[in-house]
Amino acid sequence: MVFMGKPQNRNRENIAQVLRRHGIAPTHQRIEIAHALFTRREHLSADQILKWVNSRCAETSKATVYNTLKLFLERKLIRELVVDPTKIVYDPNTEPHHHLYDVVSGRLTDIPADKLRVVGLPPLPQGTVADGVDIIIRTRPQT
């Protein structure tokens, strides 16, 4: 994936080129949403993306943000992480990796895939194969 690896500044023209390569028409709003995701290198919720985009350009609707995130997911530009039943965030890093989730602050931190080893999987339903393993280690301050 083009945006993975070391964080880099991405200008809007580079973002537009990446969107085109993935078969996505680079509208102004899609470019701004991608800019929020790929320049900040954070795990952002749809509401955080909406707020960030609207603070920098003309009003973007919540529906536009959700539809764009869905499109980016389908084209594998981002990953969706459900960190708890009430919180979904979007990850611009599509390379294999895992996460630490601080349940108090809500902060997610990437764990490189080579720092955590999965020894085995349970038996899978007949006719299926594993498509990936996502591990979220939830932490809280010691008391």
Model feature map: region roles:
Residues 31-36:
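Pre-recognition alpha-helix immediately N-terminal to the DNA-recognition helix
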Residues 48-54:
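A short acidic, leucine-rich amphipathic alpha-helix
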Residues 11-23:
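Short, Lys/Arg-enriched N-terminal segment that forms or immediately precedes the first helix
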Residues 24, 38-41, 55-56:
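Short helix-capping/hinge SLiMs at alpha-helix to coil transitions
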Residues 65-72:
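Basic amphipathic alpha-helical segments that dock to polyanions
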Residues 74-143:
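Non-DNA-binding regulatory cores of transcription-related proteins
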Residues 1-10:
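Short, intrinsically disordered or compositionally biased N-terminal tails of bacterial proteins
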